[in-house]
From Swiss-Prot:
The lineage of its organism: Bacteria, Pseudomonadati, Pseudomonadota, Gammaproteobacteria, Pasteurellales. Residues 2-106 form the Thioredoxin domain. InterPro entries: Thioredoxin, Thioredoxin-like_sf, Thioredoxin_CS, Thioredoxin_domain. PROSITE patterns: THIOREDOXIN_1 (PS00194), THIOREDOXIN_2 (PS51352). This is Thioredoxin. GO terms for molecular function: protein-disulfide reductase activity. GO terms for biological process: cell redox homeostasis. Belongs to the thioredoxin family. The gene is trxA. One of its GO terms (cellular component) is cytosol. Keywords: Disulfide bond, Electron transport, Redox-active center, Transport. Component of the thioredoxin-thioredoxin reductase system. Participates in various redox reactions through the reversible oxidation of its active center dithiol to a disulfide and catalyzes dithiol-disulfide exchange reactions. Disulfide bonds join C31-C34. It comes from the Bacteria.
Length: 106
């Protein structure tokens, strides 16, 4: 499954109403660590296909959702399960640690 790009307008449909857990990445194009983990998120999306959906929200273009969830720095990864945020990771992680973060929380 490919990484899905969401917006404030589509957040509820893409994340809250998802039938599988969602790893939500808050990012911005100017953020170096965000760009660094982007290919890792692509790999995670492929490896966890069918088990976890990976969704990205650009905080420069969509400010309501990160404000609502209290995002203060990026990258911030929030894992949603059954429409609720169950775990948060602030900062970039290597792929193996990100996979462990997902497995521990789904």
């Amino acid at each position: 499954m490919e990484v899905l790009h969401s917006t404030d307008a589509t957040f509820t449909a893409d994340v809250v109403n998802s039938d599988v857990p969602v790893l939500l990445d808050f990012w911005a194009p100017w953020c170096g660590p965000c760009r660094m983990i982007s290919p890792i998120l692509d790999e995670i999306a492929a490896e966890f296909s069918g088990k976890v959906k990976v969704v990205k929200i650009n905080i420069d273009e969509n400010q309501a959702t990160p404000a609502q969830l209290g995002v203060r720095s990026i990258p911030t990864l929030v894992l949603f399960k059954n429409g609720k945020a169950v775990a948060t990771q602030v900062g970039a992680l290597p792929k193996n640690q990100l996979a462990n973060f997902i497995n521990q929380n789904i």
